[in-house]
């Protein structure tokens, strides 16, 4: 049997992410392997840091729907390996992290090959709390 939680619990989990990101959250896409956990320093290279809205998003039914994410020019060419949600573009305080892919990943992009100076856009994104 799969572990399950109430909608209230899942909403609280997602709301904690919104609160922790503050008004300066960034989705940072890195090269390399996903770190063991959010407290582990990232050994990858920052390819692009996309600013999030001052209010990260809205939560309903255990799903965090991100508000606008600013289209940003890729800083460094490379292969996208994972993402982190951090409180600054430097990536020093990580709140959440996950996989990047073209299908079936936590964050899906049209390509994993990122080229410097090309704009990257995330038109919509959701994160669903576990335990549904």
Where are these regions (language model features)?
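Small cysteine-rich, disulfide-bonded extracellular modules of the LU/uPAR three-finger superfamily
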Residues: 1-83, 87-132
């Amino acid at each position: 049997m799969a572990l399950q939680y109430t909608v209230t619990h899942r909403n609280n989990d997602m709301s904690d992410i919104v609160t922790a990101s503050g008004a300066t959250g960034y989705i940072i896409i890195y090269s390399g392997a996903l770190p063991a956990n959010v407290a582990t320093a990232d050994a990858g290279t920052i390819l692009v840091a996309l600013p999030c809205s001052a209010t990260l998003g809205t939560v309903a039914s255990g799903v965090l729907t991100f508000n606008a994410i600013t289209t940003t020019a890729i800083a460094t060419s490379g292969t996208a390996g994972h993402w982190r949600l951090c409180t600054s573009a430097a990536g020093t305080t990580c709140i959440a992290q996950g996989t990047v892919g073209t299908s079936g990943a936590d964050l899906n992009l049209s390509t994993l090959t990122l080229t410097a100076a090309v704009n990257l856009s995330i038109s919509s994104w959701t994160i669903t709390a576990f335990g549904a």
